[in-house]
């Protein structure tokens, strides 16, 4: 019996974060032995998602439409713009706080050693949004890592260039911590006690 296809399936599972060889093997065998129908459903949904989910032209979040539901919602405060590194960070803030402004998702953080500069993060597009004059506060919600702090500093400079007050999430964020893994209470407190970036 050829195991070439089985090996490809195991390798395919390994693209997921935190999934090593052993876990990928368990997943592959589980799908083939006990969950073929679920595996087919997963394959179908994954295929459709890859085909149909793109990025919102306003905030760069994942969306099935040109403009996502948050950006299209005119009851949200268009004077506040919260910048986060990733869609899971946006989701964490949305679920844990009463924030009713808009977002901008960087899809990463500045990391010159990895070839990630302002262009890769869409900061030219962010600059255009800030220049439009609607935003009065830029809330910087990058992670408390070296790259996150570097990105926050760059964002604060960009905001000031456009006469916009930058603020940063405050207490409760552990150094080196990732927003998506914080509990709701900590994130809500940090969001509520954000400080102006100097």
From Swiss-Prot:
SMART domains for the chain: TOPRIM
The record's section on CDD domains has: TOPRIM_recR
Instruction: Tell me which UniProt keywords the record has, alphabetically.
Output: DNA damage, DNA recombination, DNA repair, Metal-binding, Zinc, Zinc-finger
What InterPro entries is this protein classified in?
DNA_Rcmb_RecR, Rcmb_RecR, Rcmb_RecR_Znf, TOPRIM_dom, TOPRIM_RecR
Which GO biological process annotations does it have? Answer: DNA recombination; DNA repair
Domain Toprim span(s) in chain numbering: 79-174
Q: Which GO terms describe its molecular function?
A: DNA binding; zinc ion binding
* ZnF (C4-type) ranges: 56-71
- Explain the purpose of this protein: May play a role in DNA repair. It seems to be involved in an RecBC-independent recombinational process of DNA repair. It may act with RecF and RecO.
PANTHER family in alphabetical order: RECOMBINATION PROTEIN RECR
Family, per the entry?
Answer: Belongs to the RecR family.
Its protein name is: Recombination protein RecR
Q: From which source organism is this entry?
A: Xylella fastidiosa (strain 9a5c)
Taxonomic classification:
Bacteria, Pseudomonadati, Pseudomonadota, Gammaproteobacteria, Lysobacterales
- Gene name of this polypeptide: recR
């Amino acid at each position: 019996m050829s195991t070439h296809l089985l090996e490809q399936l195991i390798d395919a599972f390994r693209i997921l974060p935190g999934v090593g060889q052993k876990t990928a093997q368990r997943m592959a065998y589980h799908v083939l032995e006990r969950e073929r129908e679920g595996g087919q459903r997963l394959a179908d949904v994954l295929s459709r998602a890859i085909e149909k989910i793109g990025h919102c032209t306003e905030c760069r979040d994942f969306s099935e439409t040109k403009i996502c539901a948050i950006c299209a919602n005119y009851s949200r405060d268009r004077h506040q713009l919260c910048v986060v590194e990733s869609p899971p960070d946006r989701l964490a803030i949305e679920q844990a706080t009463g924030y009713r402004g808009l977002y901008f998702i960087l899809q990463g953080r500045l990391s010159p050693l990895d070839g990630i500069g302002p262009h890769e993060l869409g900061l030219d597009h962010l600059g255009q949004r800030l220049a439009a004059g609607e935003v009065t506060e830029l809330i910087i919600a990058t992670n408390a890592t070296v790259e996150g702090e570097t990105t926050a500093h760059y964002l604060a400079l960009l905001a000031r260039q456009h006469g916009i007050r930058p603020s940063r999430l405050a207490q409760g964020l552990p150094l080196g911590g990732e927003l998506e893994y914080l509990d709701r209470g900590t994130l809500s407190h940090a969001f509520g006690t954000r400080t102006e970036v100097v």
